[in-house]
């Protein structure tokens, strides 16, 4: 009898605990549909299930907020204003949002949990963002570690972007072997030297990254990107290679690729001020877009120059394009500086780092460098060096425009 009584008591205790858990769940875990009101416009409101993050809920309803890191909380781009229902701001958001901005409701959509009805504000241009499945036209090396990915937009479609804008590219889970990359013989020296073909990239979930466009708006029907492969650094070869760059480098003619956009804020100012463009590495992309747009579409007569830094002649690309623009436009000149020219380059042009070359050969003797507008995109060290040099010349922040996606 004691055994039976013990079993009964144990069963009753378990049932009681289950009831407590179910009751707590009903109070703590949201059920039913969640309504997200957007910009006070009933037509823009979306209804979704609770759980997940605001960024995903918006994307599921066809509202694509920029997120270069794919929702990891590291890029700080997916900023929205949450007027109610977002809960407390998280420590991960405070790396990108000031306390003052937080008081105004600024949040990162990728960090906001969807638990209850919400009221948010989004920029109106977000509603012009679309998604396309594109076809790879070509994916060719332009330098040792840079490919030009050219995508065909579906027939009848267009991407209404501005020069300096960017798109987001999606990659499914994948397993990429560097040994399968198509790298022309002229670029294989460093690949063999650093044994780069041994690497593989294994990604077990969908990812999203942002890339600036190299084409300009009147190159219709295509999207063109300059993508630098993110290989592990030589001093830490066991680090995993870049996920998205590895995927992009694996793409072949005819492959399908999903993009969304357009996004952007790295746009040219509508003034008559002199424009100075500074680029390096894959930072070529928005520079090409801007310069082509100014000279070919806008027929701009603004004085402009382009200063590009590369290691050697092998790393220079679009040379004929810029030579042609310089020949056709008296208001445009361009210069390339090589930091490590090879003997076979027979280089008689500028040498050294591009910020020093720009200063020594142009800005040092410029009548008013502080009055120019500076547009730059390149590796972080280049960007920092250029900004430091410009600050020393008295250039205000408003005249220094930086695209962080290049390089």
From Swiss-Prot:
GO terms for biological process: sodium ion transport. It is found in: Cell inner membrane. Residues 32-126 form the 2Fe-2S ferredoxin-type domain. Its cofactor is [2Fe-2S] cluster; FAD. Signal peptide: none annotated. It catalyses: a ubiquinone + n Na(+)(in) + NADH + H(+) = a ubiquinol + n Na(+)(out) + NAD(+). Gene3D superfamilies: 3.10.20.30, Nucleotide-binding domain of ferredoxin-NADP reductase (FNR) module, Translation factors. Binds 1 [2Fe-2S] cluster. GO terms for molecular function: 2 iron, 2 sulfur cluster binding; electron transfer activity; metal ion binding; oxidoreductase activity, acting on NAD(P)H, quinone or similar compound as acceptor. It is a single-pass membrane protein. Its EC number is 7.2.1.1. [2Fe-2S] cluster binds at residues 69, 75, 78, 110. GO terms for cellular component: plasma membrane. Composed of six subunits; NqrA, NqrB, NqrC, NqrD, NqrE and NqrF. NQR complex catalyzes the reduction of ubiquinone-1 to ubiquinol by two successive reactions, coupled with the transport of Na(+) ions from the cytoplasm to the periplasm. The first step is catalyzed by NqrF, which accepts electrons from NADH and reduces ubiquinone-1 to ubisemiquinone by a one-electron transfer pathway. Belongs to the NqrF family. This is Na(+)-translocating NADH-quinone reductase subunit F. It comes from Vibrio vulnificus (strain YJ016). The gene is nqrF.
């Amino acid at each position: 009898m004691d055994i039976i009584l013990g079993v009964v008591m144990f069963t009753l205790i378990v049932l009681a605990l289950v009831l407590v858990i179910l009751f707590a769940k009903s109070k703590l875990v949201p059920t039913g549909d969640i309504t997200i009101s957007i910009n006070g416009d009933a037509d823009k409101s979306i209804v979704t299930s609770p759980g997940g993050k605001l960024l995903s809920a918006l994307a599921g309803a066809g509202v694509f907020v920029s997120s270069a890191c794919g929702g990891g909380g590291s890029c700080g781009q997916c900023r929205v204003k949450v007027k109610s229902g977002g809960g407390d701001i998280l420590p991960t958001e405070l790396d990108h949002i000031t306390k003052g901005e937080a008081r105004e409701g600024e949040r990162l959509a990728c960090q906001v949990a969807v638990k209850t009805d919400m009221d948010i504000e989004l920029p109106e241009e977000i509603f012009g963002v679309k998604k396309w499945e594109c076809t790879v036209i070509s994916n060719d090396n332009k330098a040792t570690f840079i490919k030009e990915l050219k995508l065909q937009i579906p027939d009848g479609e267009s991407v209404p972007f501005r020069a300096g804008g960017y798109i987001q590219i999606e990659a499914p889970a994948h397993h990429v072997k560097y040994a399968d990359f198509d790298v022309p013989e002229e670029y294989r020296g460093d690949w063999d030297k650093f044994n780069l073909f041994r690497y593989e990239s294994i990604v077990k979930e969908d990812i999203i990254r942002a890339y600036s466009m190299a084409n300009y708006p009147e190159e219709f029907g295509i999207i063109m990107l300059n993508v630098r492969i993110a290989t592990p650094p030589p001093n830490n070869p066991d680090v995993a290679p870049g996920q998205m760059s590895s995927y992009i480098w694996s793409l072949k003619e005819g492959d399908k690729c999903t993009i969304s956009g357009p996004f952007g804020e790295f746009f040219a100012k509508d003034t008559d001020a002199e424009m100075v463009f500074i680029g390096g590495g894959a930072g070529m992309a928005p520079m090409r877009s801007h310069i082509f747009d100014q000279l070919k579409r806008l027929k701009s007569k603004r004085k402009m120059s382009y200063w590009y830094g590369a290691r050697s002649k092998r790393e220079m690309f679009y040379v004929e394009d810029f030579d042609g623009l310089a020949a056709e436009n008296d208001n445009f000149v361009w210069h390339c500086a090589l930091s490590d020219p090879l003997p076979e380059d027979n280089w008689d042009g500028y040498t050294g780092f591009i910020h020093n070359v720009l200063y020594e050969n142009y800005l040092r003797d410029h009548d008013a460098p502080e009055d120019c507008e500076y547009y730059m995109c390149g590796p972080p060290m280049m960007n920092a060096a250029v900004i430091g040099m410009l600050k020393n010349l008295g250039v205000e922040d408003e005249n220094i425009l930086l695209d962080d996606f290049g390089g």
